[in-house]
Amino acid sequence: MIIKKLILSISLVMLFLPAKAEWTHVGTSGSSVLVFYVDYKNITVEGNYVKSKRLVDYHKEQKTEKGEFYWSAISIYTFDCMKKLQQVERFRYTDRMGGGTRLENDFFKSEWENVAAGTPNDNYFIRACAFRS
């Protein structure tokens, strides 16, 4: 009986843990300073809204305005597929590929804004919104 309860408890905990990202390489800047990845496995869809994560890995260590060093950033994009709008939340990390420690005092969240046509974000928007069907 105790083993059944333990297995049930572990199963419930695993159910509510966030899924581990599976990063797919989607591009590199012309100067190879930035490398872009998207987590296509964990895209969520709610009506007209699609939420997806994008990771940027930097070729060289970067420095925030507050003097903290980081190697990567993960952005959570929420797209309004009907209105062609996006909202972005960004977190920076001390190691490559979103590893190390997340910088505690470095959170950014944008207002809703238009997705500009012909930009890399426009391509990202199109691919992410395709998950609605």
Residue ranges of predicted features:
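Intrinsically disordered, low-complexity segments enriched in polar/charged small residues
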Residues: 9-10, 59
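Hydrophobic h-region of N-terminal signal peptides that target proteins for export
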Residues: 11-19
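Short, low-complexity interaction segments enriched in Ser/Thr/Pro/Gly
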Residues: 1-2, 17
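N-terminal secretory-pathway/extracellular module detecting exported/lumenal segments
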Residues: 19-74, 78-133
